[in-house]
Swiss-Prot record:
Family matches, as Gene3D superfamilies: 1.10.1740.10, Winged helix-like DNA-binding domain superfamily/Winged helix DNA-binding domain
Induction summary: By hydrogen peroxide.
CDD domains: Sigma70_r4 (cd06171)
Spans traversing the lipid bilayer: none
Chloroplast is among the record's keywords: no
Record's protein name: RNA polymerase sigma factor YlaC
Ranges in coiled-coil conformation: none
Keyword Membrane part of the UniProt annotation: no
Domain of life: Bacteria
GO function term, MF aspect, one: DNA binding
Annotated signal peptide: none
Organism encoding this protein: Bacillus subtilis (strain 168)
Record-linked InterPro entries: RNA_pol_sigma-70-like, RNA_pol_sigma-70_dom, RNA_pol_sigma-M_bacilli, RNA_pol_sigma70_r2, RNA_pol_sigma70_r4_t2, RNA_pol_sigma_r2, RNA_pol_sigma_r3/r4-like, WH-like_DNA-bd_sf
Sorted UniProt keywords: DNA-binding, Sigma factor, Transcription, Transcription regulation
Amino acid sequence: MKHRDSIEDLYRQYYQEILNYLFRRTHHLETAKDLAQDTFVKALNGLASFRGHSSIRTWLYTIAHHTFINWYRRDVKYQFTEISKNEGLTQTTYDQPEQYLSRTVKSETLRQELLKLKDQHQSVLILREFQELSYEEIAEILGWSLSKVNTTLHRARLELKKNMTKSREEERI
């Protein structure tokens, strides 16, 4: 009974966070839900062997990351899908329609430019900037050294900034 309680607690505590991460990686809510479910099934099967060398949160992100990579290699291969305006995971209210429009345009531009980055750059940016994980957690999840996380994150930010600047310049023309 204790084992079942612990996986239910993990699910309640981390499901939304893992789902958000997978949604940002897949850009498709139903796929993200399926991968999140797979992540927790794998966690359930591996919970007895969890040794505590990392936090539970980092361990779940590692499982989610590998689940995403396996799905991507198997099913996607550069297939891009559109996000429906109604598929968002959170709802925000705005005082003025202009605020909503401005935020939507910026968000869509960011999403489009993020998709243009290499997979490694996407991974490290999403884990750091959107999921707000520490550099150490990212290194553990991706199986990288701390210096590789720092270097890749720096390069990813520069590339994203360059792409965003170029995109803004093209919009002005």
